[in-house]
Amino acid sequence: MSMMDKTFTGSQTRSEAGASEPRVGRWQGILRRVLSGDALSYLKSIYWSVRLRGKLAMPLPVFTHWKTRWSVARTANLIVRDRLVVGRMETQIGQNGQEGLDSNVIQIGAGGSLEIDGFVTLGPGVRVLVGPNARLKIGDRSYVTANSKLIVKSDVEIGSGCAISWDVQLMDTDFHHIAQGAQNTQKITIGNNVWIGSRAMILKGVTVGDGAVIAAGAVVTKDVAAGQVVAGNPARVVKEQVRWVP
Ligand SMILES: CC(C)(COP(=O)(O)OP(=O)(O)OC[C@H]1O[C@@H](n2cnc3c(N)ncnc32)[C@H](O)[C@@H]1OP(=O)(O)O)[C@@H](O)C(=O)NCCC(=O)NCCS
């Protein structure tokens, strides 16, 4: 996967790329999109975009797959500085990208906030759970690939240009306590241009520095400095001062 991923935006559909295709082909394309649920996705995206801005803005600030389960409390804040794409992401791997995976879930509890600080893509099956009075901020050009989970009880901040792979889990809370009085919830901070490999897990209290790489399957329990590569469970430094190529 690379930053070359073609994200599917609210103002562009796959078939629009073939604007010069013959009339019959175009109608076939439209019919295919309607049958595949694209029309429903646009309707749902219009609803969320209007709810966000209070009027219809083009291009739509929110583009959401119709299957996405949205649950945003009345007192919650959804802030989108540029655009949020949910449930659509075509990778260069395979012919069908990541279509057909699980539905997305976006949940923001009472008083919670989800702040999208630019253009952010959440791939199919990604679940974003922001608890009551909790805050999740995601920076410009960051993307999260299929089936990852961002679980926020207190505060999670993800910088810009981050690549978060498949099946990653970020949790700022343990949910339960081992020792009485011990802190089981602490802020997670992910810097800019961080690459988090598939099936990695980032636990409470961790800060990851700019440009760091988290290897596939790593369980990160301690801070990672800028430019480090960490791997394993618990994650240990395996390389330093790297520059990964998007
Ligand atoms: C992090 C990663 C990119 C590093 O690649 P690399 O620079 O070629 O690293 P190396 O293969 O030189 O490995 C360096 C050391 O870390 C270890 N290591 C690398 N990845 C590891 C992993 N996922 N888990 C445990 N150890 C790992 C290697 O065994 C090696 O150990 P050694 O020095 O004792 O031999 C790569 O290991 C990785 O995790 N790739 C998967 C990325 C991914 O999930 N992509 C999905 C799409 S975004």
Language-model segments: what does each one mean?
Residues 2-169, 191-193, 226, 235-239, ...:
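Domain-scale signature associated with acetyltransferase and cell-envelope carbohydrate enzymes
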